[in-house]
Amino acid sequence: MAGFGEPGIDTVDAAGLTVGVVAARWHGELTDHMLERAVAAADACGARSVVARVAGSVELPVVAQALARRYDVVVALGVVVRGATAHFDYVCRSVTDGLTRVALDEGKPVGHGVLTVNTIEQARDRAGLPGSAEDKGWATTVAVLDAALAVRGLARTTQRVGFDA
């Protein structure tokens, strides 16, 4: 069940942080709205956002990497709908692996706001449209800003913990 156990963080105080948002153009009705919601979430949290667009979800990781080199956090948005071939699996895996690699290689939080769904109706229900059950553009942005604040807090911690403390 999507949304079950969701943390329910509506906004965080991310004043001074910068957000690079990259959104795919496939399924533009949905990704355009998700992009609007991501930018609105960044604004509501006090962060400044910059937007880049790419053709499809496969192109998200390389642009996310370029954004991660310039901005505090990255949000990647897209929609991948399962079809009759294995292409869905390859796209979803490469996008997920790529975005994870960017986050780890660059040491920056990267929000995975790519809807990987079986039907376009499932995507609509998660895209933050009027009547949607979920708003992944907003939620992904707030989550990645929250992660950036956690990383920043850890960087300020001088007390050592663990076996070597």
UniProtKB/Swiss-Prot annotation:
Enzyme class (EC, first level): transferase
Keyword tags: Riboflavin biosynthesis, Transferase
Positions that bind 5-amino-6-(D-ribitylamino)uracil: 26, 57-59, 79-81, 112
Biological processes, Gene Ontology terms: riboflavin biosynthetic process
Homology family: Belongs to the DMRL synthase family.
One MF term in the entry's GO annotations: 6,7-dimethyl-8-ribityllumazine synthase activity
EC nos: 2.5.1.78
Listed Pfam families: DMRL_synthase
Family annotation (PANTHER family): 6,7-DIMETHYL-8-RIBITYLLUMAZINE SYNTHASE, 6,7-DIMETHYL-8-RIBITYLLUMAZINE SYNTHASE DMRL SYNTHASE LUMAZINE SYNTHASE
Record flagged with keyword Lipoprotein: no
SUPFAM superfamilies, sorted: Lumazine synthase (SSF52121)
Record field: catalytic activity: (2S)-2-hydroxy-3-oxobutyl phosphate + 5-amino-6-(D-ribitylamino)uracil = 6,7-dimethyl-8-(1-D-ribityl)lumazine + phosphate + 2 H2O + H(+)
Functional note: Catalyzes the formation of 6,7-dimethyl-8-ribityllumazine by condensation of 5-amino-6-(D-ribitylamino)uracil with 3,4-dihydroxy-2-butanone 4-phosphate. This is the penultimate step in the biosynthesis of riboflavin.
Entries under InterPro entries matching the protein: LS, LS/RS, LS/RS_sf
Protein name: 6,7-dimethyl-8-ribityllumazine synthase
Binding-site positions, (2S)-2-hydroxy-3-oxobutyl phosphate: 84-85, 126
One GO CC term on file: riboflavin synthase complex
Active-site residues per Swiss-Prot or TrEMBL entry: 87
Pathway: Cofactor biosynthesis; riboflavin biosynthesis; riboflavin from 2-hydroxy-3-oxobutyl phosphate and 5-amino-6-(D-ribitylamino)uracil: step 1/2
Keyword Transferase in record: yes
